[in-house]
């Protein structure tokens, strides 16, 4: 905005203010106007109250008339009754108002208050079935069912009609499992429903509670997840409000927390699903509001039941895997997808290696901190051949450093960069050394190290397990904290994160020192190598202490490995070996350059130099 525009706006503002002051009414005029407005408002308020009373009376009369003619008049009123089903792992509470599950307690897990974990209660959840009738629709949420056939593991919620017919909701809690079989069946209702009806509409809602210490970290792993038929599972965005109308038919829909889930499973698929996930504010006690609207099969004649299942339990990989075997449809539900184990190749490593190794070590009765320590050592031992190969590649480059320095001194000018590079590649080729020799071994190690990055935050076994100063390895260890929230850092400092960053800096310093071959042309890259460990403090400060502990131990072992390798490597013997290889290679090829990758790279550089020379010659013409 320029100066003239600012002056213009200022003048306009001055005129408006002056005009308002000039036309301001006197005190007497203002008093009369206020008295008039108060009188008008009083009359309007009395009229609004009269209309509201009339509307309420009319609504009540209409409701009474509707209720008295409804097929389910008797179910519109009643007293709420609660029924409990439980086994050794879960306790479920059912309400006859809506005939639904209204609370779930997981016996083997505790909340942050130390009591058995409440996954949800009546105020957190809702479920409504909408049945379309010929003359009226049934909305089950506000209707009162009659509990019958009650045992420790079964209950039938019956919605009775005035004509003697009924709709049954049958629930059966399976033994030693988190699964509940749920069946809907109509009886004597053929005349109520239209002949063409074959679906029921379902509205399922739940407020996902904050069950863990770290809100932001739990938010990353709390998502509405769904499984399309014959496809891999998918989920809505975890960090912002998301809504999706799914065109695929679905096997199941899950309201997922970081470590626990409520899952609704269809025997004959869900269709026309509309899914919504709304993040909640930190401090509200909730992570997200979930809503799922969908349809599924329904037979109004009652000849074929509508079969579904619930899973209320932990996101434990093998528990979910075993729950697949309880499927009524006999198809692989792939519930284990609720535990995110990373990208395809990393997921494969986690599924077949990491989880089995973790379970094996956990079976010894060791603390989870010791289990992570042993896992880190075992992983380091397994990748040691690749680590050794990578180190020896850098050691060979290091012993050739004097020759590289001679080439750098020979071609100090920038315009000689191509010749310098060409001669350097020729040197590597003579000695049989590849500057890329250490890259492939490092790439081979990456899937293993990345596997732990995805496994540890999703390992429910680490939840509420203490180690050293960390009371819970599944969340951050805030040994240093303060009241004010600092951007990017938060209100605490994780000691394991700090130790991880320090070891990373030391590892970087040592590695850069070992690999420095006198090439000063990449100072920006060196600076970046030192900045990244510092950035890790801000990135991982809110992550689980178990993950930071793993990276700290991994970095510490990495430094010790490099120090030991450096101490045990005789660089004079290594150089002598390279000289002997060079001589042998020269005799074998009669003084000509050898084959292999380095020779090909050298040939490509010569071809590049020839083409560049041709372009220069054409430019002179």
Swiss-Prot record:
* Recorded GO MF terms: membrane insertase activity
Annotated membrane-spanning segments are 1-21, 363-383, 436-456, 486-506, 527-547, 549-569
Keyword presence, Transport? yes
Q: How does it sit in the membrane?
A: Multi-pass membrane protein
Q: Which UniProt keywords apply?
A: Cell inner membrane, Cell membrane, Chaperone, Membrane, Protein transport, Transmembrane, Transmembrane helix, Transport
Q: Which residues form a coiled coil?
A: none
Q: Which Pfam families does this one have?
A: 60KD_IMP (PF02096), YidC_periplas (PF14849)
> Which Gene Ontology cellular-component terms appear in the entry?
plasma membrane
Keyword check for 4Fe-4S: no
Query: Which GO terms of type biological process are on file?
Result: protein insertion into membrane; protein transport
Its subcellular locations are: Cell inner membrane
What family does this chain come from, according to its entry?
Answer: Belongs to the OXA1/ALB3/YidC family. Type 1 subfamily.
Which HAMAP family is this protein grouped with?
A: YidC_type1
Q: What does this protein do?
A: Required for the insertion and/or proper folding and/or complex formation of integral membrane proteins into the membrane. Involved in integration of membrane proteins that insert both dependently and independently of the Sec translocase complex, as well as at least some lipoproteins. Aids folding of multispanning membrane proteins.
Matches recorded under PANTHER family:
CYTOCHROME C OXIDASE ASSEMBLY PROTEIN COX18, MITOCHONDRIAL, OXA1
**Record's subunit section:** Interacts with the Sec translocase complex via SecD. Specifically interacts with transmembrane segments of nascent integral membrane proteins during membrane integration.
What protein name is recorded for this chain? Answer: Membrane protein insertase YidC
Organism for this UniProt entry: Phocaeicola vulgatus (strain ATCC 8482 / DSM 1447 / JCM 5826 / CCUG 4940 / NBRC 14291 / NCTC 11154)
Give the source lineage, highest ranks first.
Answer: Bacteria, Pseudomonadati, Bacteroidota, Bacteroidia, Bacteroidales
